Amino acid sequence: MSYDAYQMRPGQGRDYARQQRQQRSYQLSDDPLRQPGAPYANPAGGYPSSASMNPENPFYAAENPSFQTLAPATSEGHATYTYEEDKIPLTDSADEKYGFSQNGHSTYNLASQSGFPPSTPCGGPSSYSSALGPEDSASQVAWAKRQQAPKRGLTKKIQLTRGHWIVDHPVPTAVKNSVESRWSQGNRTQEFTHMRYTAATCDPDEFTLENGWSLRTSQQYGRDTELLIAITYYNEDRILLARTLHGVMLNIRDICKSKSSKFWRRSAEEGRPGWQRIVVSLIFDGIDPCDKEVLDLLATVGVYQDGVMKRKVDGKDTVAHLFEYTTQLSVDPTPALIQPHADDASNLVPVQMIFCLKQKNSKKINSHRWLFNALGRHLQPELCVLIDAGTKPGHKSLYYLWEAFYNNANLGGACGEIHAMIKNGRKLINPLVAAQNFEYKMSNILDKPLESTFGYVSVLPGAFSAYRFRAIQGRPLQQYFHGDHTLADRLGKKGLHGMDIFTKNMFLAEDRILCFELVAKAGDKWTLTYVKPSKGETDVPEGAAELISQRRRWLNGSFAASIYSLVHFFRIYKSNHGIIRLFFLHIQALYNAIVLLFSWFALANLWLTFSIIIEFLPDELLKNSSHTTLVVFHWINQAAKWIYVFFLVLQFVLALGNRPKGEKPTYIASFIVFGILGLYLIFVSLWLTLKALLETSVSGNIWHTLFNQTTGVLIAALAATFGIYLIASILYADPWHMVTSFPQYMMIAPSFINILNVYAFCNLHDVSWGTKGSDKADALPTVDTKKDKSTEPGTVEEIERHQDDIDETFKAVVSRAVAPFKPAETVEKPTMDDSNKTFRTRLVAFWLLTNGALTVAIENVNGLNTGLTNKQIEQQQSSKQSTYFRIILWATFGLSAFRFIGCLIYWVKRNSTRCFRKT
């Protein structure tokens, strides 16, 4: 088989495919003489050698329910495939061998509890009996073994394509036959029969057509791309990726089968089905951090295969491994395999996938450089959608995003509503999750609509947002990619090597930089908006340590980016925005400056609010109570203040020297303490407000109460807190978070300032640009060309895997992909350094506590004296404090005298014995 470069213009794909078929040196099928529609035959007898998931098959029942799924295996991680006699006719078809039955039902059943695989109606053992352990797919050793070259097969010589390793590999028979006949029949390309692998040995900026690189969708098939959906991945588990990928595929189905959209309906009528204008790109940030079970999931749908990646090509390191395939299979989060069924309107449509697996971990900005500068340059999409692995797009969410751009030619970027994954409310039991859920909700109800009204949304979350591809070309992407550490040497002073710590922090919130640069782009008038109907569900941190680490990056990045946008606001005048838009952008800039100012002083404002409000309790609410009651609440308030100050100081001690994961108990205790103090503050505030309102009802003087210095501000604050939140939530028909999450938020809110802000600012130096090595890539084989003659181009000898071997390997892949998922409980034990820092922190905390207690005790030695005048109180306080200082001074004198006595004795002793010293 010839492996020439796919260097061609749009429209040449069919001619090239015809050439390739004429040059084939081997047959794809096991039986090359098989007539169309005839079942495959296995020359060796026994089980047939291929699956026939073909809708033309008479046993392919159309009446089956949509989205039949493969049942999960047993909890032990083993799986066995058996026939279902009550559903599947006993035929010589090979469907059962691959887990797909002729009538559309899946045959993936529970393993036998006896330890032996159950027998099949044919009398033999199940071919899907898995001998792999439950930890196999997570094992780096097992994955490394699967990357080795096959031990048997035909050896073929492959010529590199302009020096590049670009090879088409046959997909498993079951995957190939899962495609509906209306898509596969008449398709003369290898789109559904082969997966294309490219070992990209270049920087993403050099992945161009001129350099010999190409993509099947654009160069071979000549298709134009309307929608490029990018899923960025780091180390999420297979269930999180399945949530995202399956949600995306459901959205693509809804777009392609939408009857309300004239654009997509007209495209289908013109012979260009909607799925041919949509590409899904999965970009993985390194082999090392990648969960290997995720690769099994991708192999199940056909877009990845073990044993095909190459670490080097002629001595050049592979930078990224690209896999291309169009699949109609999916795995849902159950996990279960989703396959099409004949004439079922709810079937998934084929999805063009490009899987980009970077060899080394080089961070998210670099992943986006592969998206925009490499893949996007070839595909030239109208719209790019960015989704983080773990974010589940809601029903028709991608359509609503696309619709917003389609109806507004000046729209450069948009985002949907991101809400926390609460699992039907079960996760709201965790107050941290509930508080974050409330934050997300109110941001989507108050903040995003406000910014969208101005035309500038300060941040389009990278977890779920979209950009017009041509809008971000030029300066927006150039500024954005200055944060890519792989460009640091090339950019020099403009890159990371030339940045100060403040600028580096700015790129922790890189999406904010892209938003500002897009709106301020010279000569254009791009706007940003919020699309309320487009919803995405994401998981949020459930532990204190994880939340603190996440918010460090968010807070430091957003703070630096906010300063950047305000300082460079004048660049907005170079844009082509109208006078009205500029006026509103000025108002928004003023608003952002005020918000930034308040966030800067949030620490002091919270302490002053707490200390002043709780003093109203004895001064205003209990002023007519007994002396004993006043004394009790005086000391309660004093204790509350001391505890507040101590735990606030403790946050600085922790933040300056400890990892959150190394001090989990202390941070949890801090959240609890600040939560209790926050409840006390709310209790006093509500009591004071209620008392004022009761007095108003008696006196009838409403205006005096509202503008009273003591209670007026409290009433206004509570109205803003409770009233505006509630009214806005009801207005948007989404009020339930006020019931399920608001109380928890009020408890956690002080910790957001006193813990998260303190930790973030104390770790401003930590920009986390370091990357991990990718030693796992050493398991991959290399490619070196050989030349028989100096005049001939170099070739590579490669063992071609037989189709039976591919299918046999696929069995184990599916069993691992749909096995029951057990989250890995990694108990992170504190390191020796953590233990040392913990001892230091607790010692310093005890030191601060004892010194602070002594200071407070002396300053408040009189306690509360309500029966004395201020002058008498001051005299008593001065007298007692003078006594303390006299004690301190005499003690100091005594210690010094004692030292002097010792010094004197030593002097006398040494000088008196000088004459008797031996020399």
UniProtKB/Swiss-Prot annotation:
Query: What Pfam families has UniProt attached to this entry?
Result: Chitin_synth_1 (PF01644), Chitin_synth_1N (PF08407)
According to the UniProt record, one GO cellular component term is: cell septum
**Record: glycosylation sites:** 187, 556
Compositional bias (Low complexity): 11-30
Q: What stretches pass through the bilayer?
A: 594-614, 630-650, 668-688, 713-733, 742-762, 843-863, 887-919
Per the record, membrane topology reads: Multi-pass membrane protein
Which Gene Ontology MF annotations are present? Answer: chitin synthase activity
Subcellular location field: Cell membrane; Cytoplasmic vesicle membrane
Disordered, as annotated region: 1-69, 109-134
Q: What is its EC number?
A: 2.4.1.16
Q: Which InterPro entries match?
A: Chitin_synth (IPR004835), Chitin_synth_fun (IPR004834), Chitin_synth_N (IPR013616), Nucleotide-diphossugar_trans (IPR029044)
Q: Which GO terms describe its biological process?
A: cell wall organization; chitin biosynthetic process
- Write down the chemical reaction(s) this protein catalyses: [(1->4)-N-acetyl-beta-D-glucosaminyl](n) + UDP-N-acetyl-alpha-D-glucosamine = [(1->4)-N-acetyl-beta-D-glucosaminyl](n+1) + UDP + H(+)
Induction (free text):
Expression is slightly lower in the yeast form than in the mycelium and shows a maximal expression in the log phase at about 14-18 h of incubation.
Per UniProt, the keywords (alphabetical) are: Cell membrane, Cell wall biogenesis/degradation, Cytoplasmic vesicle, Glycoprotein, Glycosyltransferase, Membrane, Transferase, Transmembrane, Transmembrane helix
Question: Main role?
Answer: Polymerizes chitin, a structural polymer of the cell wall and septum, by transferring the sugar moiety of UDP-GlcNAc to the non-reducing end of the growing chitin polymer.
Q: Which family does it belong to?
A: Belongs to the chitin synthase family. Class III subfamily.
Q: Please identify the protein, giving its name as recorded.
A: Chitin synthase 1
Source species: Mycosarcoma maydis (Corn smut fungus)
Recite the lineage of the species: Eukaryota, Fungi, Dikarya, Basidiomycota, Ustilaginomycotina
